[in-house]
Amino acid sequence: RTAHAAKMLGVDTVVGFTGSPIWAYLYSFPPVTEQMIEDGYQEFARRFLPILDEYQKLGIRYALEVHPTEIAFDTISAQRALEALGNHPAFGFNYDPSHLGYQGVDYVDFIYHFSDRIFHVHMKDVYWSDTPKQVGVFGGHVTFGDPRRYWNFRSLGRGCINFEEIIRALNAIGYQGPLSVEWEDSAMDREHGALESCEFVKQIDFQPSAHAFDACFEKK
């Protein structure tokens, strides 16, 4: 139904989640076998291939947000999800660097690795500490914004994400889609954050050069 609604609205990309039948196995203890993980990816494919086939018929793309609790949450799991689907042409990713950075994933390399599968981009920032904290990467069952946490989402430009390199990488792969602000900062007024984030995107975004920097020296 979502694909049909997108078609009627003239939307060519749907962003969403798939969930994961194997997220509970993340820590691999009690012991998890490779077959259990493979079965999880095959179950994901069994459920989503018919959906993606319908998307393809309608000319709509599905962009999975790479995110903890999903079947794809870092570069390797995203690659495995893509392979489980047989590299289905309707399947790609919603790129959100905030969910990669605090995990220690190379979020710029992710863009190059999936250069033809970045269907949508979330501009979202996150801060992570350079010193040990009481609450680690898994979140410790404390609320966002708690100062004991190792990481917290922040307004654009106030976290640790290097958006300069992200824009350069997106330009390098020829990305032409939207830069959609997803704003979260539990310590900041929403309206203030929305305004400054929009300005941040306007300032950080730039078009790639159509010429080499030394093109003026070329002989005519």
How should these model regions be labeled?
Residues 10-12, 25, 49, 57, ...:
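Histidine-acidic metal/acid-base catalytic patches
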Residues 1-93:
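Active-site acidic/histidine proton-transfer and metal-coordination neighborhood
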